[in-house]
């Protein structure tokens, strides 16, 4: 989730099967999905037609929650957003978040975060540059954990922005293409949202998705 002498490397390059080109799926619908996983742990409100949501939670959150707005079927389309996100002292993310059906994977493009960087404890895949910043890229395997199909074992992919921000355009295709070199299935998408996730601390977020 890893290179030999130069000559051996040349042989591997010469005889390895080509990496298939990723299939990039475009989004055809406006916002049509509300993500509300344990939103009752805080004050989650949203206006689907306006593309806005907010979440406030107090210190003492007892479990993980993920809330946001997006699309029932994900895509490689760019996502433009603006947010007011106060993450200090919380374990939380502001991220593009979604799932792939086969092979099952959970993914995050983390634009800002609180006191925990998920790549600090995962397997590094290197770095990539997108939208004015370097992103750390990493992967992890979750075993017998909650998923879109109940309890299952699946792969997680993370791109974590080094120059964090709370507004801008996320060129999703760059991240999908990078992950596809490491096993990410780039076509059979489940839902995709601009999300806030947290599991400790106190924080507030107000997010607008414009595309």
Curated annotation (Swiss-Prot):
Glycans are attached at residue 101. It is found in: Secreted. PROSITE patterns: GH11_1, GH11_3. Keywords: Carbohydrate metabolism, Glycoprotein, Glycosidase, Hydrolase, Polysaccharide degradation, Secreted, Signal, Xylan degradation. Its EC number is 3.2.1.8. This is Endo-1,4-beta-xylanase 4. Endo-1,4-beta-xylanase involved in the hydrolysis of xylan, a major structural heterogeneous polysaccharide found in plant biomass representing the second most abundant polysaccharide in the biosphere, after cellulose. GO terms for cellular component: extracellular region. It comes from the Eukaryota. Optimum temperature is 60 degrees Celsius. It catalyses: Endohydrolysis of (1->4)-beta-D-xylosidic linkages in xylans. The active site is at 106 (nucleophile), 197 (proton donor). One of its GO terms (molecular function) is endo-1,4-beta-xylanase activity.
């Amino acid at each position: 989730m890893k290179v030999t002498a130069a000559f051996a490397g040349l042989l591997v390059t010469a005889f390895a099967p080509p990496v298939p080109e990723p299939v990039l799926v475009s989004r055809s619908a406006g916002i049509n999905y509300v993500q509300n996983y344990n939103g009752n742990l805080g004050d989650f409100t949203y206006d689907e037609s306006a593309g806005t949501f907010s979440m406030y939670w107090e210190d003492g959150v007892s479990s993980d929650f993920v809330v946001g707005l997006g699309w029932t079927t994900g895509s490689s389309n760019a996502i433009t957003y603006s947010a007011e996100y106060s993450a200090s002292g919380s374990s939380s993310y502001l991220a593009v978040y979604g799932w792939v059906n086969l092979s099952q994977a959970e993914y995050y493009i983390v634009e800002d975060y609180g006191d925990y960087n998920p790549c600090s404890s995962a397997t590094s895949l290197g770095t990539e540059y997108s939208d004015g910043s370097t992103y750390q890229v990493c992967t992890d395997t979750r075993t017998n954990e909650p998923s879109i199909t109940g309890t299952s074992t699946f792969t997680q992919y993370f791109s974590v922005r080094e120059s964090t921000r709370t507004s801008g355009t996320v060129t999703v295709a760059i991240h999908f293409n990078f992950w596809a070199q490491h096993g990410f299935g780039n076509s059979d998408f489940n839902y995709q949202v601009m999300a806030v996730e947290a599991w400790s601390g106190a924080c507030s977020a107000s997010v607008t998705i414009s595309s």
